[in-house]
UniProtKB/Swiss-Prot annotation:
Record note on domains: The C-terminal basic cluster region, which consists mainly of lysine residues, is important for the formation of a stable RFC-PCNA-DNA complex, although it is not critical for loading PCNA onto DNA in vitro. An 11-mer corresponding to the PIP-box inhibits DNA synthesis by Pol I (pol).
Compositional bias (Acidic residues): 430-456
A Pfam family annotated for this UniProt entry: RCF1-5-like_lid
Gene: rfcL
Protein known as: Replication factor C large subunit
GO molecular function, one term: ATP hydrolysis activity
Binding residues for ATP: 50-57
Family membership noted in the UniProt record: Belongs to the activator 1 small subunits family. RfcL subfamily.
Record-linked CDD domains: AAA, HLD_clamp_RFC
Keywords assigned by UniProt, alphabetized: ATP-binding, DNA replication, Nucleotide-binding
Organism: Pyrococcus furiosus (strain ATCC 43587 / DSM 3638 / JCM 8422 / Vc1)
Subunit structure: Heteromultimer composed of three to four small subunits (RfcS) and one to two large subunits (RfcL).
Family matches, as InterPro entries: AAA+_ATPase (IPR003593), ATPase_AAA_core (IPR003959), P-loop_NTPase (IPR027417), Rep_factor-C_lsu (IPR023935), RFC_lid (IPR047854)
Amino acid sequence: MPELPWVEKYRPKKLSEIVNQEEAIEKVRAWIESWLHGHPPKKKALLLAGPPGSGKTTTVYALANEYNFEVIELNASDERTYEKISRYVQAAYTMDILGKRRKIIFLDEADNIEPSGAKEIAKLIDKAKNPIIMAANKYWEVPKEIREKAELVEYKRLTQRDVMNALIRILKREGITVPKEILLEIAKRSSGDLRAAINDLQTVVVGGYEDATQVLAYRDVEKTVFQALGLVFGSDNAKRAKMAMWNLDMSPDEFLLWVDENIPHLYLNPEEIAQAYDAISRADIYLGRAARTGNYSLWKYAIDMMTAGVAVAGRKRRGFVKFYPPNTLKILAESKEEREIRESIIKKIIREMHMSRLQAIETMKIIREIFENNLDLAAHFTVFLGLSEKEVEFLAGKEKAGTIWGKALALRRKLKELGIREEEKPKVEIEEEEEEEEKTEEEKEEIEEKPEEEKEEEKKEKEKPKKGKQATLFDFLKK
């Protein structure tokens, strides 16, 4: 297992240990104690807002430790956040199964909540019987629906002196001495982010003071994915390889695909390739657990495996090497338009034929068979569903698409001539045949010779409203 990060090793266990946030901590205590005294606050959610590394997440876990709560941590960046909150919200109604530990639902990165899910999350807050705490770097980017339901607690940016004092305390507990000028440089570059400063301190201590300036400067440079791959595959040094994802604007999941793709191009020995893939598979396990549980602290173990684990797997090619983008991303990029067209067709089937998504998917298979074997019927379906030219090509293929599209255009013109609006095509009223407008001279004479009473009866009969019947799809196609 990798060495425990100092950020976790020295994370405060009590609220009183949190650096220079006394006013915020006082508000948090008052809020949580109102729950414990049986008088839940008016606002059942707490929103901790402040810059990165100011102690927001640490507050939640110190609070849970001090008051004996269990923390259920979720991340708002996850697309399935609302689903997870819905699944776990039962924990906000009741205590633990044994009734011994209450739960805190902790929603991190609340400023990344999608507006579409904000109203639903706000409803869940209203139902809560146990505390819900959220954290955000940018308060103004938290959806209004959430802000209105939460009590705001502001965290101030830590000063350079605050950061320095915290670093010195860690060094004393480790029994290590670091030159003062290096500590000053770390504190200065952190911009009040204590978490980043502690990570930098550990990196400098592990890597050696002589490289401290280079290591710290490296944090300020945004890398490309090719530079990151160069660190992984261009060095046998695990410590250096771990720096690969610093300032890389890419998620660990995506970077894993890049590393995975390039292993067979860079390693020479089959056994070493297998060892590198073993590290990749372990990284993938950690990423999967993080996604399922919302515990994104597991990312650090995944990153260690996909960088340092791969770097030390064996001998690599020397000299100029070419890096390749992952086939997975290439396939997804190439199939993006195709997937969008398929989804559009499914939605049109659902709308026009009034069926579920699963039924629509099965129906599309049948429609595809029709498009490949019956061009006339395919043209009718094109008009009925309102398909575009690309959607027709998706269903029939390039060779037949032109013919079907031409027939569909002709059918649309015919429908317009008949006065049938396309938006009414799923349900058309088929009127009973009207009497022929042009009658022969003999028929006109017969009508004139009829008694007046018969004429009156016929007139009343004509004035009666004509009955229509609801057309089916097959009636429409027959036209």
